[in-house]
Amino acid sequence: MCLSPATIIVFNRKALKKFGGFGGAADSIRNRSDLENLSEYVEYAADMYGWDDIQKYCLAVYQIVKLHPFTDGNKRTAGYVLLNCLRKRGLSYTGREKNLAEQIIELVKTDPGKKEESVLNFSYFIKSRLQKRDIR
């Protein structure tokens, strides 16, 4: 499952290894309970709102950057998680990495009271830049 705590931890470690960070992979988890509840919450909320899988993945990105479960690399981790979930669905993000990073940074800045609007806006951005992967 692309939103399991173990998968999210793997992507945080990859982000720290690739881009560096002050936390170090071994002690990077700041809030394990938020991380463990993330998948269940995202599934519940997406079902409650009637959201599709892309919107659900965007909610996961929002939750990762807002809950900040790691000492470092939360935004980078959220990006990796999103791209992995899309890949597992047979989709590729075709936009520029820089634009994706900017959109994730914008999520961090949003008012928590506008979570639904923020997630939907982010999902529209993502959906407009998706392509089915050619799997041979």
Can you describe what each PLM-predicted range is?
Residues 1-136:
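FIC/Doc superfamily catalytic core
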